[in-house]
């Protein structure tokens, strides 16, 4: 991946203990909130700027990405608001916990250096939502600079501007419309955690493979002969941080396992392997065409297994709860894949990706997320 000046890249120590999927899960928590909040933010900006033409969007527009292949965070603002002919950047933060002693803000978001002086960033506002109290605040970087202390944030392992609780919470305003917004965020984070637990389940099932002696040089060369072997080998290589030889060929071969009658469990194995291989290679046009087509086919097959109670079912031998986990895991990866292809390949292959719809909200491909959420909650209590 080509490096760019607007990205702060993670140190290897930040992500080496996590697989790529685990890193993306962590990145997706804030992304869920960001894409859910856009409509609400637009309404708030309209209140601030009445009788103005307002347009609000994520940085990058339809091509925005909630994770980077090599780790790290972008320097781009979270949102851009076009207010008539003026553009204002918005940085978004939210608190999930009560009784915080400090509210922390990254230095690079608050100030910039000019003529060796530190000055507050212009043309930018902060939007902060305090979920426990259903309150929010909109303020300028200059307010942070005036009210914050400069100190170490252990969780970030870096220095930041820290606004004491007693000062910050005076800014917060109640808003009853935050109730539904925060509920939607909580539901999607619940689904995120539920589907991702499939990784831990598979680690437990396949732990015996990690305990045996593995010839790493041999395992990266041989193309597996069936889907189950494909999944096991990709899972091992992913956790060993190894890349197979001829990974492009592996991907094409893997896509041949996709058919209309495939079970949800096997779909989850396929999308895991696709995701693992895809992140390690550069696709040629014919491979991209196949992947776009097969991704669409997989999503349609998953949707066909949706039930009226919010579950997904394709088998009589696997519990509906576990089948639903497989379905949600697959939807999660396929949405990532769709957005990644748009982000990285639409410039060079616009014709191939012209019919691919960008992901507007995370988990938008779950037919009725409220029903699915309630089904999972009931199933987890049994």
Which ranges hold each PLM region?
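An alpha-helical repeat/solenoid feature that recognizes helix-turn-helix modules
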Residues: 188, 220-245, 259-289, 313-340, ...
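Acidic surface patches and DE-rich sequence motifs
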Residues: 83, 130, 215, 259, ...
């Amino acid at each position: 991946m080509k490096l760019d000046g607007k990205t702060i890249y993670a140190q290897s120590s930040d992500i080496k203990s996590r697989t790529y999927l685990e890193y993306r899960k962590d990145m997706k928590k804030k992304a869920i909130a960001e894409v859910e909040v856009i409509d609400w933010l637009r309404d708030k900006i309209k209140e601030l700027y009445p009788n103005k033409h307002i347009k609000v969007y994520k940085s990058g527009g339809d091509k925005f990405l909630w994770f980077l292949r090599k780790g790290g965070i972008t320097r781009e603002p979270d949102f851009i608001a076009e207010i008539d002919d003026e553009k204002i950047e918005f940085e978004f933060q939210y608190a999930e916990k009560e009784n915080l002693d400090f509210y922390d803000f990254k230095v690079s978001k608050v100030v910039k250096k000019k003529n060796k002086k530190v000055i507050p960033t212009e043309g930018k506002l902060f939007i902060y939502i305090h979920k426990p109290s259903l309150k929010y605040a909109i303020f300028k970087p200059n307010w942070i600079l005036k009210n914050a202390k400069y100190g170490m944030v252990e969780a970030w392992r870096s220095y930041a501007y820290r606004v004491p609780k007693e000062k910050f919470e005076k800014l917060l305003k109640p808003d009853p419309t935050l109730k539904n917004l925060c509920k939607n965020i909580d539901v999607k984070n619940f689904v995120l955690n539920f589907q991702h637990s499939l990784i831990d389940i598979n680690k437990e099932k396949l732990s015996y493979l990690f305990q045996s002696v593995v010839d790493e040089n041999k395992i990266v060369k041989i193309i597996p002969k069936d889907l189950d072997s494909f999944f096991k080998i990709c899972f091992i290589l992913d956790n060993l941080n190894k890349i197979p030889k001829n990974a492009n060929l592996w991907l094409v071969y893997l896509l041949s396992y996709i058919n209309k009658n495939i079970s949800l469990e096997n779909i989850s194995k396929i999308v895991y392997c696709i995701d693992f291989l895809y992140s390690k290679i550069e696709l040629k046009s014919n491979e991209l065409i196949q992947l776009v087509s097969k991704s669409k086919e997989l999503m349609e097959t998953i949707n066909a297994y949706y039930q009226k109670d919010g579950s997904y079912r394709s088998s009589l031998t696997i519990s509906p709860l576990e089948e639903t986990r497989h379905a949600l895991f697959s939807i999660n990866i396929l949405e990532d894949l769709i957005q990644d292809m748009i982000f990285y390949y639409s410039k060079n292959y616009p014709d191939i990706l012209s019919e691919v719809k960008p992901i507007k909200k995370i988990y938008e491909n779950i037919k009725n997320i409220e029903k699915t959420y309630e089904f999972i909650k009931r199933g987890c209590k049994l």
